[in-house]
Structure formats: C-alpha cells, structure tokens
C-alpha cells in the first residue's frame, strides 16, 4: 500500500532511486539532519515528501504521487571523476522534447550548493549542467541535483550533507531565463547564476541543433514563463547567434549576453 493521499497543498516530491548510492547518501543526511516523519512508504516534512523508489526516475512517465514539483536526488557520472555538485533540468533537445523547468528551484539549489562548498571547504566543482536525459513527460517541473563523478564521490559524506542542506534551503526569486550556448558543464552560465539574479532553467548548449523551435519550446516549458534568454555569446557561432536574436525578437523576450548580465548586476 502506498502513502496516504496528501492533504492541503501538493508536496514537493524528492525522489531517491534505491539503487543509486548518491541518492541513498543524500537521503541518509536528510533523515539525520531534519525531522522527517514516516508517512506510508515515504517520509514527510512540511511541504516536502521524500520517496525512495524502485524505478529509475529517468524512465518515469507519470508521477508516483501527486506533487507540485519533483526534485531527483541523483548520482552524476563522468570519466573525469572530478568531484562535482551539479543541478540541471531534464530534456532531450535532440528530439525537441523538454521537461517542465522551474528556474527558481535551479537557482536556489545552485547557490545553496556553492555556499555549502565554501563553508565546508569542499573540493567540488559546483555547476549548472545543460539540459539532458529524461524524464520529459511529467506534468510538473523536474530538477536533478547530483553528486559526481565516481563511486567514491557518490558516497562521500560531506557531499551528501551539502546536497541535503541545499534541498532544504528557502526558495529564492530571480528573473526566469532560458540559457543558450556554451559547453555541457556551463561555467559562464553558472557564474551568472551565482553573481546575478538570472535564474536559468533549461540550458541549450552549443553542441545541440539550436533552432528557433527548440528555443521556443524551452521558453514554453518554463513554469511562469521565461523573461529573458541568457546567451553565452563566446560559445555560439554566427549562425546560432542569429537564430537566438531572431527568436527572441519573434517571441518578444529580452536577450542578454552573460557579459551584459554581469555588468548590469541583474
């Protein structure tokens, strides 16, 4: 039997794949640091519902429980093995299919992870990642918060604690943006999010086929609507820059380069 039907407002759902060592690590610290209470097969704390699941969240096509948004606690793997704390929105740009993004969640998590890195003197890179992988069919915003990048790091206690604290950080507000350009690990977009109030949800990197339709879909799949397009001009060729300009004009949305955002201290 599953948990009882939530009462009142829908919860923010924290999903933790039981076979994911990073998810287990983060869960352990959430339950140690905060007064979550058993709630059916889950744990509840106010508006948060922590749910261990058997199915890999990447493959979800429907919500396991009613929720206002989903945060997936996850591992991140890369051949570099570089210690990493990362955040991203899921989507499959190559197919033109994107999940619903909530930039406020992405920005809040990224800033909280950076603060945890500094306070704990952690060696981890904190970064926004480009939009990639599923799930893409859920009816609410989805955000991944991850520990990388190898088996040793997934179980690192300090990393699990840092993510647990970030998840419980009060939501911050900013200007909702779609990011374009740059590499998969987006140092310039990350810098902009840490130094300004431009909150990027979907990030479409330079290596995807950057069409006006794809940018428009990213704008459409931003909860509350995107207020601007934040462009890494150094990470775009002339054709891509032209596409961004034409699309922002057609949609009636401001376009800023990262240099402009940093200079204006938005």
Residue positions per predicted region:
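N-terminal catalytic or cofactor-binding beta/alpha core of small enzyme domains
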Residues: 1-138, 150-151, 157-164, 168-189, ...
């Amino acid at each position: 039997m599953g948990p009882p039907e939530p009462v009142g407002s829908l919860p923010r759902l924290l999903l933790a794949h039981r076979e994911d060592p990073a998810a287990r690590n983060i869960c352990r610290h959430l339950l140690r640091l905060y007064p979550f209470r058993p709630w059916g097969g889950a744990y509840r704390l106010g508006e948060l519902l922590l749910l261990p699941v058997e199915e890999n969240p990447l493959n979800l096509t429907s919500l396991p429980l009613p929720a206002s948004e989903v945060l997936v606690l996850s591992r991140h793997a890369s051949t570099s093995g570089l210690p990493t704390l990362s955040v991203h929105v899921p989507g499959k740009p190559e197919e033109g299919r994107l999940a619903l993004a909530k930039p406020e969640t992405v920005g809040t998590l990224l800033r909280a992870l950076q603060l945890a890195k500094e306070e704990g003197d952690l060696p981890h890179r904190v970064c926004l990642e480009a939009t990639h992988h599923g799930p893409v069919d859920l009816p609410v915003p989805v955000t991944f918060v991850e520990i990388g990048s190898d088996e040793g790091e997934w179980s690192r206690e300090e990393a699990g604690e840092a993510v647990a604290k970030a998840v419980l950080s009060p939501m911050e507000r900013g200007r909702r943006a779609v990011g374009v350009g740059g590499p998969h690990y987006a140092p310039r977009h990350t810098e902009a999010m840490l130094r300004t109030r431009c909150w990027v949800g979907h990030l479409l990197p330079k290596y995807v086929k950057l069409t006006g339709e794809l940018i428009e879909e990213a704008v459409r799949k931003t909860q509350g609507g995107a207020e601007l397009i934040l462009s890494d001009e150094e990470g775009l060729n002339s054709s891509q820059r032209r596409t961004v300009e034409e699309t922002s004009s057609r949609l009636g949305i401001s376009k800023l380069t990262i240099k402009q955002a940093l200079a204006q201290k938005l």
